């Protein structure tokens, strides 16, 4: 739970640095631009982003994103858009990224825009039945 006033303080801090907030249309336009890289980061705790997030978003908790920007956003002069759902993590993260010289924006998604991430099925079967291999396949046993 967010402490009373935390979201307002975080928003005021970001606003004081003139960090713009994008609506859904502006975000779509940025992400659709083939001439400029735009990163979209979910600044929430991973336990939140694993339940529902925005399509194309990368989970990057705010502190980790700030500390490992070269890992998360390796393209020079790229734009960064950060979002959360409680209005605390994203503004604070955006503020730090702004101070580091990044072109950064905030986004507050509508709850209906958040979707469950795709479920990845893991198959730990180690072998493939011979019948499943194409007749013309060449099998090389390196073990």
PLM regions and their residue ranges:
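Rhodanese-like catalytic fold shared by cysteine-dependent sulfurtransferases
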Residues: 1-39, 43-143
